[in-house]
Amino acid sequence: MHERLKELRIERNFKLKEVAEKLNVTIRTISRYEDGTREPSVEMIIKFCKLYDVSADCLLGLTDSY
């Protein structure tokens, strides 16, 4: 999932700082989600899905369709 998080952020032209502000977490937290050293909670996964306008299946890498 961590690769997908970074891929979606870059595709949507968001900077780490923007995502962190929108999700009310630190830049370091987003960075750790993206590099795989930390796993997001279910609540955070839902927030990512809403922010990036994708399904949970897409975010989790179960499907490629947005």
Sequence positions of predicted segments:
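Short, charged recognition helix plus adjacent turn
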Residues: 11, 60-66
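DNA major-groove recognition helix of helix-turn-helix/homeodomain DNA-binding modules
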Residues: 24, 43-58
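Residues in the helix-turn-helix
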Residues: 29, 39, 58
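Alpha-helical residues within the helix-turn-helix
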Residues: 10, 21, 50
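DNA major-groove recognition helix of helix-turn-helix
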Residues: 34, 52, 63
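A short, Lys/Arg-rich alpha-helix, primarily the initiator
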Residues: 1-11
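Short alpha-helical DNA-recognition segment
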Residues: 14-32
